[in-house]
Amino acid sequence: MKSMIVVACLALACGAHASGWAGPPANIALSQDGRNILDTPEVAQARAAHISALQQASKNNPNPNDDGSYDPRWDNEEYWQQAEGKWNGAPAPAWNAAPAPSWNGAHAAAPSWNAAPAHSWNAAGSAPAPVAETPEVAQARAAHLAALSAAKSAAPAQQQWNAPAHQDWNAPAHQDWNAPAHQDWNAPAHQSWNGAPSWQSGAPAHQPANIRLANDGSGILDTPEVAAARAAHLAAHAQAAHSAPAHAPQQHW
């Protein structure tokens, strides 16, 4: 039985003939590296026509995001009749239409506190802009500078605190502080530092002193009273030094 089945299979196999392409072999062209099969002239022509049609359609397409692929929603009629405007519907108002009235615009009933365009505090650059002075500050500054300038220009140079060297406070060694008794610091009233009438004496009270600054503004000049007292004091010292003996023995306290 088994042998008969085997014989029948062999007979069927021998009687069967191959089925498939019976035409001439296709003209297959390979790429230069032999890895890819090139398009036939018919396929290349069809591909070029397809690409040209896509390019032409993309030029006429108002929606650049549409790549031409099929969208199943297009089968629904409601998709084309929706309330919101579609690409083929009535044009909807643009989001950047006419600007709405601003709350601080010119047509407001009362002038807005910031209706005028405010300058940015750093509009000039990265650094903050300087703060402008108020009219009161500017006026006070101008008056102050004018007063300083007037005081400097009116101050005489010979009335400075630093007198010439020959009128120095430090007298030479032979004019020592410890002079003879008759040349003592406490000299007669007409040669004393306190000999000149004081402004606090019984004389009528003077007005407040007119304070004047030095040329560079760093010091206060002597008043006429102080300058006169200083000159009298220096003159008394010079007179005492001139009248003292050259080698008189010094008297110590």
From Swiss-Prot:
Region ranges (Disordered): 54-74, 155-178, 187-206
Compositional bias of kind Polar residues: 54-66, 189-201
Keywords: Cuticle, Repeat, Signal
Start-end of each Sequence repeat: 97-100, 115-118, 154-157
Signal peptide segment: 1-18
Bias kind Low complexity: ranges: 155-167
GO MF terms held by the record: structural constituent of cuticle
Purpose of the protein: Component of the cuticle of the pupae of silk moth.
Comment, domains: The tetrapeptide (A-A-P-[AV]) repeats found throughout the protein are also present in many proteins constituting the protective envelope of other species.
Protein name as catalogued: Pupal cuticle protein
UniProt organism field: Bombyx mori (Silk moth)
Gene: PCP
